[in-house]
Amino acid sequence: MAYYGGNYDLIVVGAGHAGCEAALAGARIGAKTLLLTLNLDQIALMPCNPAIGGPAKSHIVREVDALGGEMGKNIDDTAIQFRMLNTRKGPAVQALRAQADKIKYQERMKYILENEENLLLKQETVNQLMIEDNQIKGVVTKDGTYYYCEQLVITSGTYLKGRIIVGDVDYSGGPNGQQAAYGLSEDFKQHGISLMRFKTGTPARVYRKSLNFDEMEIQHGDDYPWRFSFYHSSERLKQLPCYLTFTNYETHKIINDSLSRSPLYSGRIEGTGPRYCPSIEDKIVRFPDKSRHQLFLEPEGLNTQEYYVQGMSTSLPLDVQERMLRTIPGLEEVEIMRPGYAIEYDCIDPTQLELTLEHKQISGLFFAGQINGTSGYEEAAGQGILAGINAAQKIQGKEPVIIKRSQGYIGVLIDDLVTKGTQEPYRMLTSRAEYRLILRQDNADLRLTELGYQVGLIKEGNYQKFKEKLEKIESEKERLKSIKLTPNKNVQNFMEEHNTSGLKKPTTLFHILKRPEISYEALEYFDETRPDLPLEVTEQIEIQIKYEGYIDKQVEQVQRFEKLEARLIPDDIDYSQISGLSIEAREKLQTYRPRSVGQANRISGIDPSDISVLMVYLEQLKQRADRNQASHDDSNTETGENDD
C-alpha cells in the first residue's frame, strides 16, 4: 500500500563513505536532507581494509577536509595507528595512512549524522526512482513509501544485485554479511541508465589469540602526532602495532593446486576485478617467479580479536583458505573468524555523468562512490562531497562546482571517470595526476579551503585560521629573503657539516634553503630570533622554496591546459556536421558530449588531428555568431532602435 513519506530538498540513498559526505554537505549548506540506508547499524561501514589514506588516497581525504567534509576528522578521532609513507621520496608522493578502529569509526560518523541540523536518517530499501519529463521527483521504497525531493544522490556502493562467492558456494548478499539490493538495478535499466558488472574481494579475518606475533616483524606507527584534518584536533586513542609476514613456496603450492576450485579461474566470476588490488591467487598466477608476497596483519579495533590479513584477498574455498594461511610464519595455528570472499555487483557507466556527477539526461539525479565504478573509501568520499555540494547548489539556484584536474585529485578522479570511463574498479594513483607536484597532500587546504568557504562548508573560525596560515607562510618567506649570510669560517663549517658547497658571496636564507641538504630547522643556527611557527607552516615554507622552479614550470603547464579547458563546446553541437573528424572521433564525441576542448582531448580514441578539426569548427561558429551579432546591431541602428 502506498504511503507518503514527506518532501525533501535532497535525498541521499546509501550511507557508506560517499553517502555520508553527500548528506552532510547538503544539510550543512542548508538543504532539508533525508538519508536512506539499508541498515542504520552499518553506517560508514569498512567492509574491506580497516584503514584510511595511503598513496593518492590521503590526498583525497585532505581535499575532502579542506572542502569541509567529515572523513578526515572521523579517522583522526578513531585511528589506532598513524604512519607517514614514502618519507624518503618527494613531497608529491608522501602519504599519511591510519589504521582505524572500525567500530568506533562507524559510531562516530553515525553520531555526527544523527546530530546534524537539516538531516534525517531512515532505514529503508529504495526500489524505484520517480522521474517525470527527465526530472527527478523522488524515490519509492520496498515497503511502498513515496519520498519526494528536488535532487537525489545515489551512493549505493556494492549492494546492487550483490553476489557473494566463496569457492563453489555463492549467494545473494552485500559486503560483510549485509543484504543485497535488487530493485534499483532493474529500475535504472527502465530509465536508460547503462550498467556494468564489477567484482572486488576481501581477505579473511583471523583470531588474534591464534597468531604468533614472535614469528612476524612488528611495525609500530609514527610517534609524531599526524592528523588528516586541517581544522580539527583530538587526543589519540591507544595506538596498536601491525605485523609483517610473508607467503612462501608451500603457500603458493596449495594455491596452484587449488586453482580448479577458484571461482576466479573456473569462470564462475563474471565481473571485472580491480587491477591494483588483485587476489592472492591472481598474484601467484601472474607472478610465478616471485618466491614470496608480503602480508600485513592489521588490528580491526581496540576491543576486538579480529585481524585483517592485508595482501591476501581471496575467494578460494574455506578449507583452502585455512590450509594456505597455516603455511605462513606466525599463522601456523590460525583460526579464521570470517572467510575471504569475492563480491560481484552492478555499477553504472560513469560516462553518463557530467563533471558535477549529475546524470546528463535526468536532471537532479546524481551518482557518487562505487556505483560509479570506483574502489576505495576515499574515492567514494571525494565523489560524495562534490555530489552533495552540487545538489545543494542546484537547489539554491547557484552555479555548479567543478574541481579541475589542476585543483585536486578529486578533479582528476571525476574527470577520468566521466571522460574516459573505466573497464575495472578505478583506484586513484599519484601517477594519474599530471600536476602532482602542486597537488600534494600537505597543501590541500591551500588549494580548496577557499572553495569550501564559498559554498558554505568551512566555518568562519576555520576560515580565519586558514587566512592566518597563509599570512604566516608569506611573511616568513619575505623575512628569509631579508636575512643574508656572509661567507666566513663559521658559515663555511656549517655548509661542510651539511655536505653542501660553501658560499661564494652574501646569500639570503631564502636561497640557502633551496639547497636539498639544508632544512628550515637547520637554519635556526643562524636565525635564533625566528618566529615560533607550527610544522604545517614551516613545511609549506620549505617545500615552496625548495621546489619553486619545478612548481613554476607546473603552473605554466596548468595555464596552457586551462586554455583548452576554457574553449567550451556548445551543448547543442552536431558532430555529424563537422567534416574532417574521424568516424571514431565523431561517434565518441556524440556519445560523451564533452563540455570543453580540453575534456574532448582526454577521450580515448580522439587524436590531435580531430582536436584541430574541432577547434577550427568552433572558431568558424564563433565568427559566424560575431557576424550575425554585428548585422543585428547594424539593423537596429538603421531603424533607430538605439536612439535615445
From Swiss-Prot:
NAD(+) binds at residues 273-287. FAD binds at residues 14-19. Its main location: cytoplasm. Its cofactor is FAD. GO terms for molecular function: flavin adenine dinucleotide binding. It holds the Pfam family GIDA_C_1st. This is tRNA uridine 5-carboxymethylaminomethyl modification enzyme MnmG. Gene3D superfamilies: FAD/NAD(P)-binding domain, GidA associated domain, C-terminal subdomain, tRNA uridine 5-carboxymethylaminomethyl modification enzyme MnmG/GidA. PROSITE patterns: GIDA_1 (PS01280), GIDA_2 (PS01281). It is found in: Cytoplasm. It comes from Natranaerobius thermophilus (strain ATCC BAA-1301 / DSM 18059 / JW/NM-WN-LF). Residues 625-635 have a biased composition (Basic and acidic residues). Residues 625-644 are annotated as: Disordered. NAD-binding protein involved in the addition of a carboxymethylaminomethyl (cmnm) group at the wobble position (U34) of certain tRNAs, forming tRNA-cmnm(5)s(2)U34. GO terms for cellular component: cytosol. Homodimer. Heterotetramer of two MnmE and two MnmG subunits. Keywords: Cytoplasm, FAD, Flavoprotein, NAD, tRNA processing. One of its GO terms (biological process) is tRNA methylation. InterPro entries: FAD/NAD-bd_sf (IPR036188), GIDA_C_N (IPR049312), MnmG (IPR004416), MnmG-rel (IPR002218), MnmG-rel_CS (IPR020595), MnmG_C (IPR026904), MnmG_C_subdom (IPR047001), MnmG_C_subdom_sf (IPR044920). Signal peptide: none annotated.
